Design a protein with these regions (language model features):
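Alpha-helical transmembrane segments and their membrane-interface boundaries
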Residues: 1-222, 229-245
Length: 245
């Protein structure tokens, strides 16, 4: 699933950069990229299933192929604007975020409905706890560094964003697995991200702002899969599943 998601999301990101360079509307771009990424995931997995190499239950990962379309930077900065009482900037950014998420969600819902794809939560992996932790650290760091690159951050800021996420995000996951409410775990983890960013920034004479260091790490905690799944349930009229994720 991760390999196919890598291929599908890479193709979607290439299309997004191409369309944005040509001045195409952001909403149309997000929708087209959602169709390409999710559609490519579905096509590749179907080919693998037809060849007998994988089982059909791997189709459940198709939503992960569009996570790169979560506009994390404007989402986080919009909420920061609201917290500073800058409602004009905050509402503008969050409205932009909402429109893009709806555009991408339409692609997820339509493809999921056409191909009758599962929207259930995947079964947890049965891995050695040490290996599981190492994979969480690695994937969190790579994801945050990748998001920082999408935000046009400098290489040093990308590396530090990955390091901060590699510490904070696995800690959040383990707090949730230990029984802590997800929102409380996220609050503690995000607070930790801010503290780490404040520690790192002076190391480079504050050449890199706390925002550029912390936002990529925070974006890895955005529940994109839950959002897209809920929007798909909502579009299908299943309000209970939409509300519960």
């Amino acid at each position: 699933e991760c390999s196919v998601v890598f291929l599908a999301a890479g193709a979607g990101q290439y299309l997004r950069s191409t369309l944005l360079k040509r001045g195409v509307s952001h909403m149309a771009t997000w929708m087209a990229c959602g169709f390409l990424a999710a559609g490519l995931y579905i096509a590749v997995v179907n080919v693998l299933v037809a060849a007998g190499w994988v089982s059909p239950n791997h189709m459940i990962g198709f939503i992960s192929s569009v996570l790169f379309l979560v506009p994390g930077f404007p989402m986080v900065t919009g909420m920061l604007d609201i917290s500073r009482m800058d409602f004009l900037a905050g509402i503008s950014r969050l409205t932009y975020v909402g429109l893009l998420l709806i555009s991408a969600s339409f692609a997820v819902w339509l493809l999921g409905s056409l191909f009758h794809l599962p929207l259930a939560t995947p079964a947890p992996l049965t891995l050695d706890p040490t290996l599981d932790l190492l994979l969480q650290v690695l994937s969190s760091g790579v994801a945050a560094a990748g998001f920082a690159m999408l935000f046009a951050a400098s290489p040093v800021a990308c590396v530090w964003g990955g390091v901060i996420a590699a510490v904070a995000n696995p800690a959040r996951i383990h707090m949730v697995e230990a029984g802590m409410p997800a929102h409380m775990a996220a609050t503690i983890a995000v607070f930790g991200v801010g503290i780490l960013a404040e520690i790192v920034a002076p190391l480079h004479q504050r050449k890199y702002t706390r925002i550029s260091l912390s936002v990529p790490a925070v974006v890895t905690m955005v529940p994109g899969v839950l959002f897209y799944r809920s929007m798909s349930h909502f579009a299908s009229g299943d309000m209970y599943s939409a509300a519960t994720g």
